[in-house]
Amino acid sequence: MGKEAATRVRRRERKNIASGVAHVNSSFNNTTITITDAQGNTIAWSSAGTMGFKGSRKSTPYAAQVAAEDVSKKAQEHGMRTLEVEVAGPGSGRESALRALQAAGFTVTSIRDVTAIPHNGCRPRKRRRV
């Protein structure tokens, strides 16, 4: 009567891509790192949250470093060697993620800050008074 669900696991095919772009998005709460090819197709990604950090630990530089090590391991399985790095956001994991990518053996050809700056757009959140 009922169809059986397809339980076949989709294998990730090994692409052989030598160079790509690492997008490091570091917010106040989390750090996500996505490695794409030159056209923008995602090769590998990771974040501090997917590495098991919860709550305020996700926003630490160490969590960003662990996420960068994980995504670099995944990207090197596809044969990636050189990276351009685009860093966005105001968070604390920017520099540590960049250092972890360099320490993983990638040749970093360029580093760009692509943080969006509003031309008087949305009203910002209120200042914290501690």
UniProtKB/Swiss-Prot annotation:
One of its GO terms (cellular component) is ribonucleoprotein complex. GO terms for biological process: translation. Gene3D superfamilies: Ribosomal protein S11. HAMAP family: Ribosomal_uS11. Located on the platform of the 30S subunit, it bridges several disparate RNA helices of the 16S rRNA. Forms part of the Shine-Dalgarno cleft in the 70S ribosome. Belongs to the universal ribosomal protein uS11 family. This is Small ribosomal subunit protein uS11.
